[in-house]
Amino acid sequence: MIRMSVLYPATEGHVFDHDHYRDRHVPLALRTWGPKQAEIDKGVDGPYVAAVHFRFDSLEAMTAALSGEGSTQVTADVANYTNITPVVQISEIV
């Protein structure tokens, strides 16, 4: 099982619309990429404003999903909710 975590660092002057992220962006990513599971974190304290963790069956499944045509739409939507450049971590769940 592979987990792709997308983390949004709390940077000076950051903007992050949690409602848009929860209600529009993550559902768009779910429809487009079809992961097995997704969890959203809303940062309360610490170095990150928000994060999402997607689970895929395999690295190949994740790569195929992210390479699809709809990924352009998912990426374009980022500007609608934040000015933060996210950090992406790909992990194998052991």
PLM feature spans:
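Macromolecular interaction modules
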Residues: 1-94
